[in-house]
């Protein structure tokens, strides 16, 4: 039995908006627009600057940032407006997504279209959404102090919260849409499939570290790095003393290594599980791998990089869908009507 049609559509819209938010966030980062707005004003920040005087005030605030001093000291007002508008759209769309998600919850709860367990789950998602907004500002603040870029650790945390939010929303949508656990498989194969999906999440977080360090701008060949599969600089004592995850070479190598590991581990899944979901997941993994290579050799072309980022979420969605279709030996079938009373 499926959940109320309106609830299913609403969750589908929220998932779609989250993916679009990922695209906008990626473009914001790739165009170096994220530090153009130097204040966090959740309410009054809805209104953009109006008139040249207001724009000049915003540009003066931007002039106090490390990014301006190191990278954009000669930026014109028109160019500043361009990067400001990109970040403004990023923040405004985040507010819109929050409203679209939060406002219908009381209505669905009062009209009994969702049960208490689903209400609690959705309120947890709303709380995570608030944390995501705060984490976004916490990330931006790291680029307003000393260095002209945000902390790659905070960027990874920002992305991880998005991954968590999207996964919960997508799983809820699948259950409300009537997706059921219909294919029985062994515990070993089920947990192997789950581990590959977990590796996908790890790889997405590693991608955020790569992006935060601008590591994609170096070693723009594949499969070799500086003429070798394993670059010699990985064996440098300086690297290990300075911090492995602070090093551009180490982080990019890890990202490459996990990408290959995911492909190798995902390849046998369709033959083990014998489901269309496993084939879809493998196809997404393969395409995402090719997008990653294309992004690297293009020296992070904006379109390819944005597609690579959002397709990571598409691959994750395919993985969650694959797992939702599986039932372990000895377990009872999980019905697809979570969310209704």
From Swiss-Prot:
**What is the annotated quaternary arrangement, including any partners?**
Interacts with CtaB.
Provide the protein's localization.
Cell membrane
| Cofactors named for this entry | heme b
Which Pfam families does its entry note?
COX15-CtaA (PF02628)
- What pathway, per the record? Porphyrin-containing compound metabolism; heme A biosynthesis; heme A from heme O: step 1/1
BP terms from Gene Ontology:
heme A biosynthetic process
Which species expresses this protein natively?
Anaplasma marginale (strain Florida)
> According to its UniProt entry, what is the function of this protein?
Catalyzes the conversion of heme O to heme A by two successive hydroxylations of the methyl group at C8. The first hydroxylation forms heme I, the second hydroxylation results in an unstable dihydroxymethyl group, which spontaneously dehydrates, resulting in the formyl group of heme A.
Q: Which positions in this protein are listed as binding heme?
A: 255, 308
Q: Which domain of life is it from?
A: Bacteria
Name-wise, this protein is: Heme A synthase
In the Enzyme Commission scheme, what number(s) does this protein have? 1.17.99.9
Q: Which reaction does it catalyse?
A: Fe(II)-heme o + 2 A + H2O = Fe(II)-heme a + 2 AH2
Output the Gene Ontology cellular-component terms. Answer: plasma membrane
Major subcellular site = membrane
Family recorded in the similarity comment: Belongs to the COX15/CtaA family. Type 2 subfamily.
Keywords (alphabetical) are:
Cell membrane, Heme biosynthesis, Iron, Membrane, Metal-binding, Oxidoreductase, Transmembrane, Transmembrane helix
Q: Does the keyword Disulfide bond apply?
A: no
**Membrane protein topology class:** Multi-pass membrane protein
- Listed GO MF terms: metal ion binding; oxidoreductase activity, acting on NAD(P)H, heme protein as acceptor
Q: Membrane-crossing residues?
A: 7-27, 92-112, 118-138, 159-179, 190-210, 253-273, 280-300, 302-322
User: What is the top EC class of this enzyme, as a single word?
Assistant: oxidoreductase
